[in-house]
Amino acid sequence: MNPANFQPPNPPFHWAPMLPPDPPRCGMFWNTKNITDQLKQLQDTLNLAKSMEKELEALKMIKDAKGSVENAVQDSGVEYLEARKMDLGQQEMLSVDAANSLMSTLRAQLEPFRFVVDENSPWEEKSAAVRLTCKMKKSIRNKLWKKRKRRCAAEMRAKEPERFEQADREADEWREKEMAKDMANRKVDEMKAIEKIKAKRERKRLEPELELALIVEEMQELRSLRIEKLKKQGHFLPEEDDKFFESVRAAVEQEENQAQSLINTETEEHVIASEENTTLTTSNKTNNDTDKDSNTNAASCERTMKAPDNGCDNISNLPVEVYHYYYGSNIDMGRLIEIRREWDAYLSAGGSRIPGHWVQPSPPANEIWASCLVNTPKRDLS
């Protein structure tokens, strides 16, 4: 809006409008209440300026229509002029004066706020403006926080019946569980009481039997002591006839076994003597030294077998297989070679007792496991 375009050719003299005094640039001017009042006045002035702009635009439209009210469009502005019986020039003059006065008032109201954007203004003004801005933002935040708080409180109040219902349901469930537990505990207590009563009755019923059992045990102990005493004195008890007959039967069987073993040893001696004769006739002349050694060994063995004082009487009690294996190799060279060949089937080529397909184990992990190993030297068994 530029009121200079609406200036009349000869404007009349008019007094300058009354302007508010210039408030102090710092201090009380930048408090919240004063700034709020100033902003309200500024908002009212801006609203008046917008209305004045619309009025001037309407007057310009009427003036462009050659200033004739009759030729102008019949609108609210023309009707107003006809009702007031005012000329278009006079109304234009009054409107321009009001617009100029309004612009002066607007400049006066905006003048205190010029220090905020002016770079040459002192820092006190800027700091006061910044503090006021912070206060206003804080006030806005507080309003928003209070609004959120009220909304949360309303939501909590709306949810309060639901919480009460939930608490009631939980209390009912807990009460039912506790009642079920109490009933189960009462049943368990009743069962325990019944079991105690049954145990007491059973104990009362078994007490005489237990007493009789203890008496029987004591009588048996006393009887065993008397039997031992009689045995020491040389008495024979009739209830031990089976044991006596069994001991007699075992002694007879032992004598029969000893007689049979003597017969077996005699037959073995005859068999060994016949084998010696056959091996002596079939041996080569190149093995004379070996035959002599075997004959000497056989003679020494025969002497030891015939000598009763050297403790060789147990040889006659050995079975045929044992005698043929252990003592036949000392007498018969053929039997010795046969035994050696039987053992060769279980020995490896290197003379070790470990089979050839045996996997060599890994070394021990530490000294403790190594101490468990037994280092036995290899023996030549061939």
UniProtKB/Swiss-Prot annotation:
Pfam families on file: PDCD7
Subcellular localization: Nucleus
Ranges in a coiled coil: 31-63
Domain of life: Eukaryota
Disulfide bonds: none
Region: Disordered, residue numbers: 274-297
Stored InterPro entries: Apoptosis_promoter, PDCD7
Alphabetical UniProt keywords: Coiled coil, mRNA processing, mRNA splicing, Nucleus, Ribonucleoprotein, Spliceosome
Any single GO BP term: RNA splicing
GO cellular component terms attached to this protein's record: spliceosomal complex
Compositionally biased spans, kind Low complexity: 277-287
Subunit structure as annotated in this protein's UniProt entry: Component of the U11/U12 snRNPs that are part of the U12-type spliceosome.
Stated name of the protein: U11/U12 small nuclear ribonucleoprotein 59 kDa protein
Organism: Arabidopsis thaliana (Mouse-ear cress)
